[in-house]
Amino acid sequence: MEQVPLHCCRIEHRMDFQQSLITTVHDYSLGNLDAIDFNRELQQRPTALLIPCLMEEFKRPALSLIRDTLSKLTGLSSLVIALSAESIEDVTAAEAFFADMPFPVQVHWTNGPAVREVLSSMGSLGLDLTGPPGKGWAVWQGLGVACQQAEVIGLFDADIRTFGSGYPERMLRPLLNPSHGMAYVKAFYSRLSLETQALQGRATRLFVGPLLASLEQIFGTLPYLRYLQTFRYPLAGEFAFTRDLAMNLRIPSDWGLEMGLLSEVYRHVAPSRITQVDLGLFDHKHKSLGEKPGEGLQRMASEIFCTVLRSLMEHEGCVMSMDQLPTLEVLYRRVGEDRVRQFGLDSAINRLPYDRHGEELALHRFADLLRPSLSRLLASTIAHQLPSWSRLNSCNPSFAMDLAYAGRAGRQSPSYTPSAIRLRRPNHSPSKLQIQANSSTTSAA
């Protein structure tokens, strides 16, 4: 079969205009994007982009594409790179990589020694903020940094190979105009491989979709399940929110980040203030299925499963028991096999390659995870979630500033400890409580 380069594909006049529980912003491919107008909108409301990043991403072309595309956003307030790196030299190299951007860039060293010291300092207040390291931990730190200045925060992964100017414009614009009334934006897209044009996104297509449909047959049409099924790509790692919302979200620290965030958004925001935006064709670094249950997509699916069931407990008071598990296993396999057939037809008509045998194998691997995952969840139902920044600010109003400072200047000198950071901060004014206390002491004297 002759392959047409993916970047040459352009669907003219898409006529899917359906709406449901949450607002859907479609891509009609009319070419109506306006960079000048978008930069003007960015200047009206302080906006930051957050990119969680491993040092290895700097060796791949995707991050260069993202940087060069973002360099045209002259109206952007700031860019935060939440970087996991092994040394100061790596951080310095990352700063040099983004040196010529037309807006401030903070490379925040998420696992740097000064950052770890600041995080550990909250242990005396009963808060364990030291990990586990991963995307959720990096996103949580990055939000603490970005929320100090920005009113709108957008998040993109560092491995997007199809990144274009339309991505940030379409995802941020619903939040830039307050009259739209939106608080949260979630991306969706067509996941196709740049090399083979085959369908990607197995965790979404073969696990999350069949799982939610199966749970609906067991528990009925619950509002929370309907909410999750409304999202066309619930595992999309690209989203944006207002600062007010971001400050109040607990951030999951495991691979259930995307589903866990949807649960948090459901808790805080009415569906009328949520929108999903079509970004068109999309490709990024692919994750393997994994040889063992604790690896690759299998590990991801297990943690997603636990996150969904835990969220059902929280929002609907529904608990999946071991007695119900055989029903779920049968339903999941049947629905999943139906989806494999559907994706096969979709691929055939669009002249895309489709490995049906490989898809069936992945489906069965996912099905085998249900029983051990449920056993583990019932043994310990408490999720490891990092506390919201609103809670942290109530514990220590200077904590976010200390963390941001440690992630930037704190890496350069061992003398920068949490206490030293507070002492060295310029124009550090006393709190209202301190002023009141001093006034009371003076009056008493």
Regions inferred by a protein language model and the residue ranges of each:
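Active-site-proximal specificity loops/subdomain of glycosyltransferases
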Residues: 90-149
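Short beta-strand/loop segment that forms part of the nucleotide-sugar
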Residues: 75-87, 106-112
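Catalytic donor-sugar/metal-binding loop of nucleotide-sugar-dependent glycosyltransferases
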Residues: 253, 263-282
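Short beta-strand-to-loop acidic/aromatic patch adjacent to the donor-nucleotide binding site
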Residues: 149-161
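N-proximal low-complexity "stem/linker" segments adjacent to membrane-targeting elements
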Residues: 9-71
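Conserved donor-nucleotide/metal-binding helix-loop-beta segment in metal-dependent transferases, i.e.
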Residues: 163-189
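A recurrent flexible, glycine/aromatic-enriched loop bordering the glycosyltransferase active site
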Residues: 195-205, 216-238
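Terminal low-complexity segments of carbohydrate-biosynthetic enzymes
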Residues: 2, 6-27, 102, 285, ...
